[in-house]
């Protein structure tokens, strides 16, 4: 089964998405948190054996350097260098944001003009950009990246990881649906509580994606950085009141 996640247009596009979730000025965001989310995302791609292009890895190296500088004792020279690296990164993200807004503006104008001509509009390179903002897919994947990172730490500490030859997505789909029996909703991270190893965690996630794809499940996230809940797809589904 081929489940495709929407790729970002590059590392700056991913960073911009992460920064935008804070809904504040780019220069005020908690950069260490953003770096950790970026690294978790890249690590998850690798764990799922999805291709990670070189530019993402180069950026990951730069981010790890910035993070390490921020964790060092506050010696003046080191602090200045760390601040310079951080400010340079934030400036790159800000410039990319402006470029992307310009691209979206040009695309809107292009579509507006196309209404007055009979021929089909020419495709622009920005056409795929709006799919990046699909919260259902992207926020789910980013949330899963954080869950997987925590589960890896848990497995490393336990030293009792149970391995199996193979996990089937079809079997995991049944487990996911059974987890919702008698519940209005299930918090995403609770789905992975009983998982015994990384491969089981990943297969559970792929099963969840497939159930969303087939519209058997829906996602609910009431606010940025809030918990993501899984719910069975029903007609005119309502978010249960707390």
Swiss-Prot record:
InterPro entries to which the protein is assigned, alphabetical: ScpA, ScpA-like_C
Compartment(s) where it occurs, according to its Swiss-Prot or TrEMBL record: Cytoplasm
GO aspect biological process, one term: DNA replication
Alphabetical keyword list: Cell cycle, Cell division, Chromosome partition, Cytoplasm
Source taxon at top rank: Bacteria
Pfam families xrefs: SMC_ScpA (PF02616)
Coiled-coil intervals: none
Broad class of the protein's primary localization: cytoplasm
One GO CC annotation: cytoplasm
HAMAP family to which the protein is assigned, alphabetical: ScpA
Subunit structure: Component of a cohesin-like complex composed of ScpA, ScpB and the Smc homodimer, in which ScpA and ScpB bind to the head domain of Smc. The presence of the three proteins is required for the association of the complex with DNA.
Assigned protein family: Belongs to the ScpA family.
Function: Participates in chromosomal partition during cell division. May act via the formation of a condensin-like complex containing Smc and ScpB that pull DNA away from mid-cell into both cell halves.
Family annotation (PANTHER family): SEGREGATION AND CONDENSATION PROTEIN A
Name of the protein described by the UniProt record: Segregation and condensation protein A
Source organism of the structure: Streptococcus pneumoniae (strain P1031)
């Amino acid at each position: 089964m081929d489940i495709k996640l929407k790729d970002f247009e590059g590392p700056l596009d991913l960073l911009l998405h992460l920064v935008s979730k804070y809904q504040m000025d780019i220069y005020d965001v908690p950069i260490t948190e953003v770096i950790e989310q970026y690294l978790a995302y890249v690590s998850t791609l690798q764990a799922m054996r999805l291709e990670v292009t070189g530019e993402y890895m180069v950026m990951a190296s730069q981010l790890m350097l910035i993070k390490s500088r921020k964790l060092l004792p506050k010696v003046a020279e080191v602090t200045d260098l760390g601040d310079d690296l951080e400010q340079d990164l934030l400036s790159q993200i800000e410039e990319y944001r402006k470029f992307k807004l310009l691209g979206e503006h040009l695309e809107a104008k292009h579509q507006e003009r196309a209404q007055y001509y009979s021929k089909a509009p020419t495709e622009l390179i920005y056409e795929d950009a709006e799919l990046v903002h699909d919260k259902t897919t992207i926020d789910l994947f980013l949330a899963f990246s954080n869950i997987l990172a925590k589960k890896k730490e848990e497995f490393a500490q336990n030293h009792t990881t149970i391995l199996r030859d193979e996990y089937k997505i079809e079997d995991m789909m049944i487990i996911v649906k059974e987890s919702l029996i008698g519940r209005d909703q299930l918090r995403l991270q609770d789905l992975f509580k009983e998982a015994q190893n990384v491969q089981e965690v990943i297969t559970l996630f792929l099963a969840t994606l497939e159930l969303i794809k087939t519209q058997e499940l829906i996602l609910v996230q009431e606010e940025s950085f809030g918990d993501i809940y899984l719910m069975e797809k029903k007609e005119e589904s309502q978010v249960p009141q707390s």
